């Protein structure tokens, strides 16, 4: 069983679902135009990941091996429906903004992948923690990419935060600089691709720097005696 520290490290960095596994690229590229949209989808994804991992772990012994994938999909679809109804009731503006990408969480490879590779083989607590930290890793990349695109495209941060957090959140909006016309490349999918590529490259550079700082083991010299 993986330790909590390993689960955190895997979810946030070593096996990040967006930057390492390259899963969930469709919502990552389509929804991350603003921080608000990115954070909203990230929270929804975390809820579904944690819930699906917990349920799959609890019922894993009673699911026949031959039909496990359809059962996992049904569990995930049920949770996504619950999240969609909650968002419709309490964050209707964000619900309209995210649109089809909320129900498409059902097909997100991150969720079905964690259910199959981890939750179905581990106890409930590690499964919940795995879902939490994988979801946090995905949300962190979503928010970071959303911040990059929103700053470059609109010159703002947390625009539309009231859609997620309520009317009081209008005070969170920050205008970093005024733009007369939006930078469309940053707001459209090509800009999202470039942003993801930049984040992946940055992670690889950091990984290389960290690897170079690790003490290297000296090669053992094998002495051969010739007589």
UniProtKB/Swiss-Prot annotation:
Keyword check for Cell wall biogenesis/degradation: no
Cellular component terms per the entry's GO annotation: plasma membrane
Keywords assigned: Cell inner membrane, Cell membrane, Electron transport, Membrane, Translocase, Transmembrane, Transmembrane helix, Transport
Domain of life: Bacteria
InterPro entries according to UniProt: NqrDE/RnfAE (IPR003667), RnfE (IPR010968)
Residues that span the membrane, as ranges: 18-38, 39-59, 69-89, 93-113, 125-145, 182-202
Predominant cellular place of this UniProt entry's protein: membrane
Compartment(s) of residence: Cell inner membrane
The keyword Phosphoprotein is assigned to this record: no
EC code(s) of this entry: 7.-.-.-
Membrane topology qualifier: Multi-pass membrane protein
Entry's Gene Ontology BP terms: electron transport chain
Class of the enzyme per the UniProt entry, highest EC level: translocase
Functional description taken from the UniProt entry: Part of a membrane-bound complex that couples electron transfer with translocation of ions across the membrane.
The protein's assembly and partners: The complex is composed of six subunits: RnfA, RnfB, RnfC, RnfD, RnfE and RnfG.
Family (UniProt): Belongs to the NqrDE/RnfAE family.
Protein name: Ion-translocating oxidoreductase complex subunit E
Native species: Aliivibrio fischeri (strain MJ11)
Organism lineage: Bacteria, Pseudomonadati, Pseudomonadota, Gammaproteobacteria, Vibrionales
């Amino acid at each position: 069983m993986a330790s909590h520290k390993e689960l955190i490290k895997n979810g946030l960095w070593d096996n990040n679902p967006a930057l390492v596994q390259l899963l969930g690229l469709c919502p990552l590229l389509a929804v991350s135009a603003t921080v608000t949209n990115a954070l909203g989808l990230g929270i929804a994804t975390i809820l579904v990941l944690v819930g699906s991992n917990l349920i799959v772990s609890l019922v894993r012994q009673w699911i026949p091996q031959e039909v496990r994938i359809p059962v996992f999909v049904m569990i995930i679809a049920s949770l996504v429906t619950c999240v969609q109804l909650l968002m419709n009731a309490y964050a209707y503006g964000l619900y309209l903004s995210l649109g089809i990408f909320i129900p498409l969480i059902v097909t997100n490879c991150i969720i079905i992948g964690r259910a199959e590779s981890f939750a179905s083989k581990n106890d409930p607590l590690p499964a919940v923690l795995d879902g939490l930290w994988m979801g946090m890793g995905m949300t962190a990349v979503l928010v970071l990419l959303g911040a990059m695109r929103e700053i470059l495209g609109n010159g703002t941060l947390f625009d539309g935060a009231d859609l997620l957090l309520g009317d009081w959140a209008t005070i969170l909006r920050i205008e970093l600089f005024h733009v007369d016309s939006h930078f469309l490349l940053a707001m459209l999918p090509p800009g999202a691709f470039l942003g993801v590529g930049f984040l992946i490259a940055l992670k690889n550079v950091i990984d290389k720097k960290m690897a170079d700082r690790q003490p290297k083991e000296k090669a053992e010299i094998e002495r051969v005696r010739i007589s």
